[in-house]
Amino acid sequence: MQQIRIHKNDKVMVIAGKDKGKIGKVLKVCHKHNRILVEKVNIVKRHVKPNPYRREHGGIIEKELPIVTSNLMIICSSCTSPTRVHYRYSESGKKLRICKKCNESL
């Protein structure tokens, strides 16, 4: 299984699919299924029945669904462009994520 280099609260851009070009913040990363939940991306409508025991109203609800990791690229905070990520170790031995374009730490 491929390593997921995108973490929670990262800013990402969709590079393939119906939401291509949209930018959002990562809400959740699912390593088991290789999918990522992104804010305001891949929105679908669900028809929900009312449930009086939980005090839920029925109706049509819009919610986000996870996207496959390969359809996303992380956005570098310094060069503000979508980029690939590689790793480098600092002098203290800490593992850092590095932008491939500008060589700055993410």
From Swiss-Prot:
PROSITE patterns assigned: RIBOSOMAL_L24
Quaternary structure (record): Part of the 50S ribosomal subunit.
Family: Belongs to the universal ribosomal protein uL24 family.
InterPro entries from the UniProt entry: KOW (IPR005824), Rib_uL2_dom2 (IPR014722), Ribosomal_uL24 (IPR003256), Ribosomal_uL24_CS (IPR005825), Ribosomal_uL24_KOW (IPR041988), Translation_prot_SH3-like_sf (IPR008991)
Protein name: Large ribosomal subunit protein uL24
Source organism of the structure: Lawsonia intracellularis (strain PHE/MN1-00)
Record-level Gene Ontology MF annotations: rRNA binding; structural constituent of ribosome
Function: One of two assembly initiator proteins, it binds directly to the 5'-end of the 23S rRNA, where it nucleates assembly of the 50S subunit. One of the proteins that surrounds the polypeptide exit tunnel on the outside of the subunit.
